[in-house]
C-alpha cells in the first residue's frame, strides 16, 4: 500500500503552460507558393485569454499577473489581454471553447496537466501539440494536501485515521475527477481500501475555501495557491505529492518521505 501511494501521488505535478488555439495558415514568411510575404502588424486588437477555471484560483491569479505585466511592457497602448474565465469539466469546457476560436493569434488558452490526464482517461480527444500551438511553460510544481487549521484533519495522521475509519468518512474538494487532485484522491481511496466522498468546484480557490469553511476535510492544491492562507493560519499543509522536498515550503513532509518504498 505505502509503495503504491508514494509512486502514484509523486507523479502528480502541476504542468501549466500557455498555448494558442488551433494550427492556422501561415501569416508571415512565405505564402503557399514559397514567395516572401510581408508580416502583418500584430497585434492590432485585444487578445482573448481563456482560463478554463473559475476566478481566484492559482491559475487565474498567476495568469492575470502575467497578462497585466505583458500588457504594460509588451503590447501597444491600444491593445490589452482580456481574461475570460470559462470553468467546468475539470478545465475541458474552456479548453474546448478555445478550439472553436479562429487560429489567428488573438486567442490564447491556459492549459495544465489536467488536459493530458483527461486525454489519457478518454474524457477528451484533444491532443495538446496537435490542436494547440504551445507558447511557454509557466509553472511546474507539486501538489499539496491541505487540511483545516483545527479539527480531525488538521494533521496528516488525523486525516489518515479518519480516512481509514470507513467508507465516505472524509470529503475531499476537487476540480474534477480527471484533475491531478482527483487522481490523487482516487489513489488514496485505492491505497487504503476506503471510498472517499468528493465535491467538485470550479477552481482551486473554491476548493481551498471549502476546507476553510468545513464543507470538505481536505484538498490537493498547487503549493503556491495556498502559501498565503497557510501563513495566515487558516489552512494547514499536510503533505506534498512529490518525490523530494519543496523549496517553497521546506518544512512540509513529502509523500516519498512519509510513505517510503517497502
For each of these PLM feature ranges, what is it?
Residues 113, 149, 223-224, 242:
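Short secondary-structure boundary segments
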Residues 167-168, 216, 235:
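Short, high-confidence coil segments that cap the C-terminus of an alpha-helix
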Residues 60-64, 68, 182, 186, ...:
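Short, surface-exposed alpha-helical segments at coil->helix boundaries
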Residues 1-48:
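Short, low-complexity disordered leader/linker segments with a strong preference
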Residues 228-262:
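C-terminal lobe and pocket-closing loops
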Residues 75-77, 97-107, 120-206, 255, ...:
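Hinge/capping helix and adjacent helix->loop/strand transition within the periplasmic-binding protein
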Residues 31-130, 194-218, 229:
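N-terminal (or domain-start) structured segment
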Residues 109-111, 172-174, 220, 239:
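Short beta-strand segments
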Amino acid at each position: 500500500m505505502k509503495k503504491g501511494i508514494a509512486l502514484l501521488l509523486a507523479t502528480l505535478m502541476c504542468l501549466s503552460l500557455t498555448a494558442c488555439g488551433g494550427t492556422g495558415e501561415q501569416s508571415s514568411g512565405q505564402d503557399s507558393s514559397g514567395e516572401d510575404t510581408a508580416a502583418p502588424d500584430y497585434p492590432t486588437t485585444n487578445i482573448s485569454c481563456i482560463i478554463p477555471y473559475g476566478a481566484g484560483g492559482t491559475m487565474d491569479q498567476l495568469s492575470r499577473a502575467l497578462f497585466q505585466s505583458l500588457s504594460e511592457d509588451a503590447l501597444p497602448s491600444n491593445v490589452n489581454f482580456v481574461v475570460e474565465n470559462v470553468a467546468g469539466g475539470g478545465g475541458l469546457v474552456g479548453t474546448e471553447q478555445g478550439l472553436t476560436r479562429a487560429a489567428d493569434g488573438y486567442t490564447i488558452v491556459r492549459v495544465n496537466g489536467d488536459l493530458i490526464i483527461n486525454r489519457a482517461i478518454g474524457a477528451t480527444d484533444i491532443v495538446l501539440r496537435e490542436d494547440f500551438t504551445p507558447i511557454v511553460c509557466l509553472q511546474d510544481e507539486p501538489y499539496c494536501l491541505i487540511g483545516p487549521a483545527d479539527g480531525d484533519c488538521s494533521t496528516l495522521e488525523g486525516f489518515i485515521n479518519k480516512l481509514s475509519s470507513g467508507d465516505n468518512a472524509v470529503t475531499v474538494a476537487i476540480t474534477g475527477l480527471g484533475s491531478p487532485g482527483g487522481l490523487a484522491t482516487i489513489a488514496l481511496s485505492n491505497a487504503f481500501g476506503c471510498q472517499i466522498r468528493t465535491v467538485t468546484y470550479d477552481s482551486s480557490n473554491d476548493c481551498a475555501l471549502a476546507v476553510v469553511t468545513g464543507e470538505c476535510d481536505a484538498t490537493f492544491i498547487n503549493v503556491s495557491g495556498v502559501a498565503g492562507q497557510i501563513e495566515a493560519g487558516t489552512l494547514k499543509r499536510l503533505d506534498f505529492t512529490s518525490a523530494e522536498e519543496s523549496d517553497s515550503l521546506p518544512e512540509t513532509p513529502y509523500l516519498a518521505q512519509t510513505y517510503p518504498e517497502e
